[in-house]
């Protein structure tokens, strides 16, 4: 019986050791990817924040009616959801999906969805939520190419009045262990009080290049969401894999203890049998 128990524990030790190798390797890969994603995030964030300041001044100077500021009359809402292509990243994806579900459950008929990432597509399909478009296999360092494709689709849907409001749903990165799901409204723009700078003059008039301004702003915004999402994904995966590796180490310690106790018991029993046999022969 003890021999069978020892064989079973050996198998478990081998299995857990193999799993630990995988989780440790994935943790190291995620750490390297996170480092790269954070550098990319800082670069994009500076560009995005500067563009926001410029856009605010431009919008505040527009006095004529404009659908990108005053709305287009449509009651449909578009949610662009940023998820990951790969799993094993803790609650990263499910937190985003849960936020979307809570947001659209009161008005499903007027809620439309564009999803980014294989995992988001899979979750939405299981929930029976149809999508207008799906974007997968996004590179670890997203570029303006991916952002431009999505931005053009958003502009097309909004300008054709298929949607009246556009929201970006993504995970804002703060640290490897802290991310927050945000639902950011990007269209129509919110007009604030007229700019304090009365000496700004646009030539030609802003309205003549509004479409170009809008596309560039959406590209910057989407790229910022991509950068936050990738950093959050890799931070979540690194944390999850490090936690799994720690759990595997704890389990191996317990299995080693069980193995040694069982082996000691088997040795003691064998010695007792030998001694007992010797006594019987006297």
Curated annotation (Swiss-Prot):
Broad class of where this protein is predominantly found: membrane
A Pfam entry, by short name: ATP-synt
Gene Ontology biological process terms from the UniProt entry: proton motive force-driven plasma membrane ATP synthesis
Localisation per UniProt entry: Cell membrane
Source organism, top-level taxon: Bacteria
InterPro entries named among the record's database cross-references: ATP_synth_F1_ATPase_gsu (IPR035968), ATP_synth_F1_gsu (IPR000131), ATP_synth_F1_gsu_CS (IPR023632)
Membrane-topology annotation of the record: Peripheral membrane protein
Annotated S-S bridges: none
An MF annotation (GO) of this entry: proton-transporting ATP synthase activity, rotational mechanism
Keywords: ATP synthesis, Cell membrane, CF(1), Hydrogen ion transport, Ion transport, Membrane, Transport
Cross-referenced CDD domains: F1-ATPase_gamma
GO cellular component, one term: proton-transporting ATP synthase complex
Physiological role: Produces ATP from ADP in the presence of a proton gradient across the membrane. The gamma chain is believed to be important in regulating ATPase activity and the flow of protons through the CF(0) complex.
Assembly with partners or alone: F-type ATPases have 2 components, CF(1) - the catalytic core - and CF(0) - the membrane proton channel. CF(1) has five subunits: alpha(3), beta(3), gamma(1), delta(1), epsilon(1). CF(0) has three main subunits: a, b and c.
Record family assignment: Belongs to the ATPase gamma chain family.
Designated name of the protein: ATP synthase gamma chain
Source species: Clostridium botulinum (strain 657 / Type Ba4)
């Amino acid at each position: 019986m003890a021999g069978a128990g020892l064989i079973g524990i050996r198998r478990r030790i081998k299995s857990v050791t193999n799993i630990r190798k995988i989780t440790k390797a994935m943790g190291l890969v995620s750490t390297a990817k996170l480092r790269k994603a954070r550098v990319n995030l800082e670069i994009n964030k500076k560009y995005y924040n500067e563009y926001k300041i410029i856009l605010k001044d431009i919008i505040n100077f527009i006095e004529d009616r404009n659908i990108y500021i005053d709305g287009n009359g449509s009651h449909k809402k578009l949610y662009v959801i940023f998820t990951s292509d790969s799993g094993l990243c803790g609650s990263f994806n499910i937190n985003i999906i849960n936020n979307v579900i809570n947001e659209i459950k009161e008005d499903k008929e007027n809620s439309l969805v564009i999803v980014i990432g294989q995992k988001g597509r899979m979750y939405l399909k299981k929930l029976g939520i149809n999508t207008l478009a799906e974007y997968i296999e996004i590179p670890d360092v997203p570029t303006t190419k991916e952002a431009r494709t999505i931005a053009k689709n958003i502009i097309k849907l909004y300008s054709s009045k298929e949607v009246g409001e556009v929201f970006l749903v993504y995970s804002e990165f703060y640290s490897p262990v802290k991310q927050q799901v945000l639902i950011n409204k990007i269209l129509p723009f919110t007009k604030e009080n007229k700019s304090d700078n009365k000496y700004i003059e646009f030539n030609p008039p802003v309205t003549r290049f509004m479409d170009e301004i809008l596309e560039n702003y959406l590209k910057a915004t989407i790229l910022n969401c991509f950068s936050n999402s990738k950093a959050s994904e890799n931070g979540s995966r690194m944390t999850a894999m490090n936690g799994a590796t720690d759990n595997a180490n704890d389990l191996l310690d317990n299995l080693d203890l069980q193995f040694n106790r069982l082996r000691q018991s088997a040795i003691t029993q064998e010695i007792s049998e030998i001694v007992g046999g010797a006594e019987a022969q006297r």
